[in-house]
Amino acid sequence: MQYKKEALLLMLFAVLLALTQRFSYSRTKDHLQKMYACWKDHLEEPHLSTWFDPKKRPDVIATTGWLAPVLWEGTYNREVLEQYYKRLNITIGLAVFATGNFSKEPLRRFIKSADKYFMVGYNVIFYILADSTYNLPYFELGPLRTLKTWRLFEEEMCQDCNLRNMNNMHSKIIQCIQYEVNFLFMMAVNQTFKNNFGVETLGKSVAQLHAWWYFKKPRDFPYERRTKSAAFIPFEKGDFYYHRAIVGGTPLNVLNLIEQYIKGITDDNTNKLVSTFESHLNKYFFINKPARVLSPEYNWDPRFKTPPEIKHIKIAWKP
C-alpha cells in the first residue's frame, strides 16, 4: 500500500514538473523557433552588394573604414531586403523613455509618427518606459502594432536619469524583450518620423551619425578627453561622432552596449568624474564598430540649414 502511494506521488510530481516546464519555457521555445528560422535562412541573406551601392552617392561618406554601409538616400534597395525579411516573419522592438514633460505631447507625437512610418508591414512592439503609466496619452495603433508600458523603477542614490533609464532597460531586455523581438531600437522621444524608416536599418548593431558633427572635423568632436574617464578617446583617434537619439541592433548587442555604459559610468562616478551617456556611447562604438551606420538623413535637426547632401529626411530632431 505504501509503495502504491509513493508511486502515485512520484507520477504526480513528474506530471507537475512537465507542466511547469511546458509553461515556463513556452515563451523561450517560441523565441528559439524564431531564431532557428532566421538561422536556417541565414545563408540566403542578401549580400551587401545586392542591395547597397555607395557609388551612387559620391558626394558623401557612404562606407566606413571597416566596410559597414552608411545609409543615405539612393544608396540602398529596400525591396531586395524586403524579400528576405518578409519570409522570416520578424518582430522589431522600439523602446522609448517618457519622463517628465516628455510623457504627454512629445510621446504622443513620437508614437503617432512611428506608427505611420516605422517598419511598415512588419510586426512591431512599442515599449514605453515612463515615470507613471497612469497618465500616458491614448494611442490608436495600426495593424501589426502592439504597445507595452512599464513604470520606471526608482533607484536609491541615483541622480543620473540616463543611468536609471539604462538600468531599467537592462532589466527589461533580460526579462522580456529578448524573447519577443529579433531587432531592437532605443530612441529619444523628442523626435518625429517624417518618412519611412525601413529594414535597411536592421543589423547586429546600429549607430546614428550626429547631424551637427558629421560636417565637422574629427579633431573637433566633443569626445571625452579626460584620460581618467572610462569614455576617454585620444585626440588623434575616432571615426565619427554618434548621436544618442537612435541606437539599435539585436537585443543582445543592445544589452551589451547598456552593460558597457553602466560599467563605464559607474567607474567614472567612483573616480568622481561626471560623464555623459553620449560620451560612453561614442567610446563603445569606437571599440565595437557598428554594422550599420545611419546618415544624418535619419535624424536631422530642422533648425539647421539643410545642405545638398541631405536628400530625404527620415526623422526630425527636436532638442
UniProtKB/Swiss-Prot annotation:
Its main location: Golgi. One of its GO terms (biological process) is carbohydrate metabolic process. Its cofactor is Mn(2+). Residues 1-6 are cytoplasmic. The active site is at 278 (nucleophile). Pathway: Protein modification; protein glycosylation. Substrate binds at residues 97-102, 188-190, 210-213. Residues 27-319 are lumenal. Binds 1 Mn(2+) ion per subunit. It catalyses: a beta-D-galactosyl-(1->4)-N-acetyl-beta-D-glucosaminyl derivative + UDP-alpha-D-galactose = an alpha-D-galactosyl-(1->3)-beta-D-galactosyl-(1->4)-N-acetyl-beta-D-glucosaminyl derivative + UDP + H(+). The chain crosses the membrane at residues 7-26. GO terms for cellular component: Golgi cisterna membrane. It comes from the Eukaryota. The conserved DXD motif is involved in cofactor binding. The manganese ion interacts with the beta-phosphate group of UDP and may also have a role in catalysis. Belongs to the glycosyltransferase 6 family. Synthesizes the galactose-alpha(1,3)-galactose group by catalyzing the transfer of a galactose residue, with an alpha-1,3 linkage, on terminal lactosaminide (Gal-beta-1,4-GlcNAc-R) disaccharide borne by a glycoprotein or a glycolipid. This gene is not expressed in humans. This is N-acetyllactosaminide alpha-1,3-galactosyltransferase-like 1. It comes from Mus musculus (Mouse).
